[in-house]
Structure formats: C-alpha cells, structure tokens
Amino acid sequence: MKFTIKDVFLVLAVMITSMTSFKSYSQDAHQMWLEGSKGKLYALLQYPDEVKKDVKYPLVIICHGFSGNCESEMQKDLADDIVRNGMAALRFDFNGHGKSEGLFQDMTVPNEIEDLKDVIKWAQKQPWVESIGLVGHSQGGVVVSMVAGELGNKIIKAEALMAPAAVLRDDALRGSTMGAYYDPYNIQGDYVELPGSPEAGSLKLGKAYIETAMTLPIYETARKYTGPTLILQGTHDRVVPYTYAERYHEEIKGSQLKLIEGDNHMFSNSLRQSCQFVANWMKTQLEGWKVINVNI
C-alpha cells in the first residue's frame, strides 16, 4: 500500500496532538560500552523522563546501516521519538563503525548479527526491561530481520524494518557494492576499495563480507519471525529498490508494508514523520494499546 508524504504528515499530526512541544532527548543519552563480536560496542541509552524505580519499560534497540553510526540524524530522531512515547531507546555502533572497536574491513553481516545478539543478551539481564523491540535501517534492517527470525517473538516482541537492504546479497553476487565493482568469484587481495564519499570517506570492504553476503539466507531466516513487523520504504530509493520491501512483506506473514511515494533511501523528504510513525507503531506493539486507530 502506498501513501504520500502529505498523507503521513496528516496522520501523524493527529497522532501527536496530545504530545507536548518538541523536546530533544539526545543530550540526555547515557554513553555505554557493550561487548560485541569484535570488541567493545559504543552505545547510547535514553530513558523516558518519568523513569521510576522498580518500574519496567519497553526497550527499543536501533540498528544503523552500512557505514553508518548511532549518532546520525535518523538514529537520534528515532531514539527521541521512542523516548517521547514512554519507552527506552538503545542505539549502538556495529563493529568497525563509528566509535566501536574493530575494523570496517572485518565487518560482515554475520558478525553484525552477533553484535546485535550480544546487545540483546545485555538487555535481557536488565531488571527494568519489560520487553524488547528492534528497529533497523538498510543493512541494519537485514540484521534485525534475521535476528528476529532466529530468536523468535518470545524474545523480540516487534520489529520495524526501514528500507531493509536485502539487495546486498544480489549486489555481492553481481560484483557491485556501493559503487565498487569486482569479480565475486576471484577477489584479488583481502578487500575491495570502496569509492570515497563525504559521509564515509574511503572504506575497505572485506573479502569475507562479500563471500558471506553471497550465500546469506536473508528471507529464509526473516520469514521465521511471527511477531508484529512493520516495513517502511520510499518508492524513489536508488540504493535498495522498494521491490525488496515488497518481497519482505510477502515472506513475513502478517507484516505491514508502508511505501512512501517519492522518498529516498534516507527518508530525506519525510524523516521526522517516518521516525514518529515508527515510534508510534512500536509503542502500540510493545505496550499493547494504540494512540489512535488510523488506517493508511
């Protein structure tokens, strides 16, 4: 089902009429270091203002995409909106990204999966965590979908996939990843040099990343998840064609698919509205009630 950016804005305007004026919670984030697959993971934890002793709260874990980090605008907006909805938000840098330990060259989707599992294990040990939901963007969406498929809905109560990059497997098979071209069956050396960019600079894509991506059972694993699933993507996404979101929708039974007409991979035209939409949706799943019943 497709809806325009204007439609999203109007729906969300209704949803948040009872909310107070905008307040950024990012400055209140608690810096943490958690164990991961390649060393320490840098993380930021935010609580609702009204956090109380001996009270449990839903926790939403947010996963960034390929070459991203937990301090990007999207990650901050998601965390702030989640906290404003009375839940806790934990965002972290995958190994080899941002401030976390490890080399980008050694990063693979399988070891990012292990990173997320390690973060979830930490969350399960916290006495204040009532339930766990996952949000992932791009490659982070693939990681979220596979972890949810592996752990099931007894542990992961809901997942939201924002422009999930299942295309990464096809990219590896055809030898084209983020502007770099290579022979996937005859990689020279230990890595492929990615074109430089203002955001990421020059990065080395490890041979292990390509080899594991080529056989990654993305949909086979993701379809095992039977809990609530939201899939959100723009129809003008040039990084991941929205047909991959449609495939996710077909594979994960009972999932909700929302296509934003004209938006891109980073949700540039609707970032605030999209983050609010995801946070509101997650609240309804983790707290068991809806702010307002709206069919889009």
Placement of each model-derived feature along the sequence:
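The alpha/beta-hydrolase serine catalytic core
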Residues: 31, 41, 142, 149, ...
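Conserved alpha/beta-hydrolase
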Residues: 79-101
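The serine-hydrolase catalytic nucleophile loop
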Residues: 67-79, 94
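N-terminal cap/lid segment of alpha/beta-hydrolase-fold proteins
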Residues: 25-55
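Alpha/beta-hydrolase fold nucleophile elbow
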Residues: 127-138
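Short beta-strand element of the alpha/beta-hydrolase
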Residues: 55-65
